[in-house]
UniProtKB/Swiss-Prot annotation:
This is Persulfide dioxygenase ETHE1, mitochondrial. Residues 1-7 form a transit peptide. It comes from Homo sapiens (Human). It comes from the Eukaryota. InterPro entries: Metallo-B-lactamas, Mito_Persulfide_Diox, POD-like_MBL-fold, RibonucZ/Hydroxyglut_hydro.
Length: 254
């Protein structure tokens, strides 16, 4: 029993990217859009990936990457965001050698376009791309190659999910994406979402499979709830989406 507990404790340390773990993980927050940005690095090779950077906090991210002695290979987006402008474009200029990455189905510009099943490699690690459309057609979830953690974007939030009433969203598609691409991961796989509005930072597949108030419903009930949310549109959508279609590079003013 003691050995089993120790193995679990060691795995949890590894999953969280603590000082004794081979992978480095940092979770950062942008308060205006309540967006999480994730830095993952291989402590051995010093190669790193940044998930869902925000324009306003990209200089902060670049500074941290330099302080930690990492080399950023990719600035990746889980989808074309509507509530903030991505920092991918700025990071390409702040950290030469960094490439922007987004799903091909997003229709957005990037250095590299990915599809379901593609891997993003950094050092000894890789992020598996799992298409998880529904919030938008181009949404993806990034799963670490040992299935210890998943970065779910807006597809799956902690006790919630992304909305489906704009950007060609589809509630039925989202329901099946989460159940087939995320809930099939191990129960102790850590869930790291793109946003949280209630002070939470992380969940697990098992927690969301059993406790998520929307996604524990039937598909029919889920579709009905999502169709009756009547939420206001994101404040930045009119300029965030066009900018994000250009990798966060805004049109120069005359």
């Amino acid at each position: 029993m003691a050995e089993a507990v120790l193995r679990v404790a060691r795995r949890q340390l590894s999953q969280r990217g603590g000082s004794g773990a081979p992978i480095l993980l940092r979770q950062m927050f942008e308060p205006v859009s309540c967006t999480f940005t994730y830095l993952l690095g291989d402590r051995e090779s010093r190669e790193a990936v940044l998930i869902d950077p925000v324009l306003e906090t990209a200089p902060r991210d670049a500074q941290l990457i330099k302080e930690l002695g990492l080399r950023l290979l990719y600035a990746v987006n889980t989808h074309c965001h509507a509530d903030h402008i991505t920092g991918s474009g700025l990071l390409r200029s702040l950290l030469p050698g960094c490439q922007s990455v987004i799903s091909r189905l997003s229709g957005a510009q990037a250095d590299l376009h990915i599809e379901d099943g593609d891997s993003i490699r950094f050092g000894r690690f890789a992020l598996e791309t799992r298409a998880s459309p529904g919030h938008t057609p181009g949404c993806v979830t990034f799963v670490l190659n040992d299935h210890s953690m998943a970065f779910t974007g807006d597809a799956l939030l902690i006790r919630g999910c992304g909305r489906t009433d704009f950007q060609q969203g589809c509630a039925k598609t989202l329901y099946h994406s989460v159940h087939e691409k995320i809930f099939t991961l191990p129960g102790d796989c850590l869930i790291y979402p793109a946003h949280d509005y209630h002070g939470f930072t992380v969940s697990t597949v098992e927690e969301e499979r059993t406790l998520n108030p929307r996604l524990t419903l039937s598909c029919e009930e889920f579709v009905k709830i999502m169709g009756n949310l009547n939420l206001p549109k994101p404040q930045q959508i009119d300029f965030a989406v066009p900018a994000n279609m250009r990798c966060g590079v805004q049109t120069p003013t005359a």
